[in-house]
UniProtKB/Swiss-Prot annotation:
The gene is ura2. It comes from the Eukaryota. One of its GO terms (biological process) is 'de novo' pyrimidine nucleobase biosynthetic process. GO terms for molecular function: dihydroorotase activity; metal ion binding. It comes from Schizosaccharomyces pombe (strain 972 / ATCC 24843). Pathway: Pyrimidine metabolism; UMP biosynthesis via de novo pathway; (S)-dihydroorotate from bicarbonate: step 3/3. One of its GO terms (cellular component) is nucleus. InterPro entries: Amidohydro-rel, DHOdimr, Dihydroorotase_CS, Metal_Hydrolase. Its EC number is 3.5.2.3. Zn(2+) 1 binds at residues 12, 14, 95, 240. Binds 2 Zn(2+) ions per subunit. This is Probable dihydroorotase. It catalyses: (S)-dihydroorotate + H2O = N-carbamoyl-L-aspartate + H(+). Keywords: Hydrolase, Metal-binding, Pyrimidine biosynthesis, Zinc. It is an enzyme of class 3 (hydrolase).
C-alpha cells in the first residue's frame, strides 16, 4: 500500500544555529517537508530584518530546494516601521514567546498591550502573529495550566484585531482546540506530530518526550487527533521539531524539545492510518498550512511517496541527535518521488 502526496508544509521548525544548523537542515527534506516556517529563537534572537535575511541565506546555502519562510522574534524592537520593512522583504510573520516559558525565551513577552501598534501594522500588511500560547511561569501557574490560562488573551487579541492572522502554535489541550474553533477564519492552530502520541506519563518517564508546552491528558490527545483528522482548515501541521544535544536532554531538568524532523511524514502517517483517516493527511500536512500562509498550490516541487513498509527509527541521527521514539518500528516509510 502506498500514498502519494505533495511535500509537507511544516509551519513550525527549529533549525538552530552554527554546527547544529548544519546537522539539522538536511533532515527537513529527509522528513518529507518541502515548505518550512522557521522559528527565530536563536541566541541572540532574530529581531531585525537584516538578521532574519542573513539567517535565511545561511539556511539556503545548506538546502536550496526546500522553501524556507522566515519570522521575527517579537520584542520592543518590533516597531510598526520594522513590520513594514519586513513585509516588503518577504518575511512572513512574528513569533511571540512568553517570557521564560521555553527554549531561548528570556527576551519574551510579559504584556501584549505595548505591541498593539505593531499588531495593527501586521494586520495591515498581512503578516502573521505566531503565538506560543502559554502564560509566563509564576507561582500561580503550572505546565498544565499555562496554556488554558492563556486562551482568554488569544480571544482578546482576536477581538481587538479581527483581521490579523494569528496562529496558536503547538496546541496541546482540548481547550485550545475549542478556542481556535471559536475564533473567526483569521485564527488557526498548529498541531505537532508528537502531541498526537504523547500524554503526561510519557514525558515524566522519558526526557526525549519532554517539550514545551508539555503533553497533557489522554482526553487532550484525543482532541488533537480529532482536530488534525477533521479536515477543518483551521488546523494544520507544525512539527515544532526542536533538536538538542544528547547531553542537554539527559540533564535535570531536560531541555524542552522533541526532534521529529527526519521522520515527520512517517510519524504523521502512522497516526492517521491508525485512525482510519489517511484521506485527511494531505489536507492537514500539505494544503491547509499553505493556504493560510498564501503559498501558491502549484506544487512545482516533487511529491513524496509514503509506502507501508516497516522500518526502525535509528537511535541517533545527524551528529548524535536522538529522534522521537528511537528504536521503535514505524509502518510508513517516506521517500521522494
Amino acid at each position: 500500500m502506498s500514498l502519494k502526496i505533495p511535500g509537507l508544509a511544516d509551519m513550525h521548525v527549529h533549525l538552530r544555529q552554527d554546527n547544529m544548523l548544519k546537522a539539522v537542515v538536511p533532515t527537513v527534506a529527509e522528513g518529507g517537508v518541502s515548505v518550512a516556517y522557521v522559528m527565530p529563537n536563536l541566541i541572540p534572537p532574530i529581531t531585525t530584518v537584516d538578521a532574519c535575511l542573513q539567517y535565511k541565506k545561511e539556511i539556503e546555502q545548506l538546502d536550496s530546494k526546500t522553501t524556507y519562510l522566515m519570522s521575527l522574534y517579537l520584542s520592543p524592537e518590533t516597531t510598526p516601521e520594522v513590520i513594514y520593512e519586513a513585509a516588503k522583504k518577504g518575511i512572513r510573520g512574528v513569533k511571540s514567546y512568553p517570557k521564560g516559558a521555553t527554549t531561548n525565551s528570556e527576551s519574551g513577552v510579559e504584556s501584549y498591550e505595548p505591541f498593539y501598534p505593531t499588531f495593527a501594522a501586521m494586520q495591515e500588511t498581512g503578516m502573521i502573529l505566531n503565538i506560543h500560547g502559554e502564560v509566563p511561569p509564576s507561582k500561580d501557574n503550572t505546565v498544565f495550566t499555562a496554556e488554558p490560562k492563556f486562551l482568554p488573551t488569544l480571544l482578546d487579541l482576536h477581538q481587538r484585531f479581527p483581521k490579523l492572522k494569528i496562529v496558536l502554535e503547538h496546541c496541546t489541550t482540548a481547550d485550545a482546540v475549542e478556542a481556535v474553533k471559536a475564533c473567526g477564519e483569521s485564527v488557526a492552530g498548529t498541531i505537532t506530530a508528537h502531541h498526537l502520541y504523547l500524554t503526561q506519563k510519557d514525558w515524566q518517564d522519558d526526557p526525549y518526550c519532554f517539550c514545551k508546552p508539555v503533553a497533557k491528558t489522554e482526553r487532550d490527545r484525543r482532541a488533537l487527533i480529532e482536530a488534525a483528522t477533521s479536515k477543518n482548515p483551521k488546523f494544520f501541521f507544525g512539527s515544532d521539531s526542536a533538536p538538542h544535544p544528547r547531553s542537554s536532554k539527559l540533564k535535570t531538568p531536560p531541555a524542552a524539545g522533541v526532534f521529529t524532523q527526519p521522520f515527520a511524514a512517517s510519524y504523521l502517517a502512522e497516526v492517521f492510518d491508525k485512525e482510519g483517516r489517511l484521506d485527511a493527511l494531505k489536507d492537514f500536512a500539505c494544503i491547509f498550512g499553505r493556504k493560510f500562509y498564501c503559498i501558491p498550490l502549484d506544487f512545482k516541487e516533487s511529491n513524496i511517496v509514503l509506502k507501508k513498509e516497516s522500518f526502525r527509527v535509528p537511535e541517533s541521527v545527524a551528529n548524535d541527535l536522538v529522534p522521537f521514539h528511537p528504536n521503535e518500528v514505524l509502518q510508513w516509510h517516506c521517500s521522494w518521488e
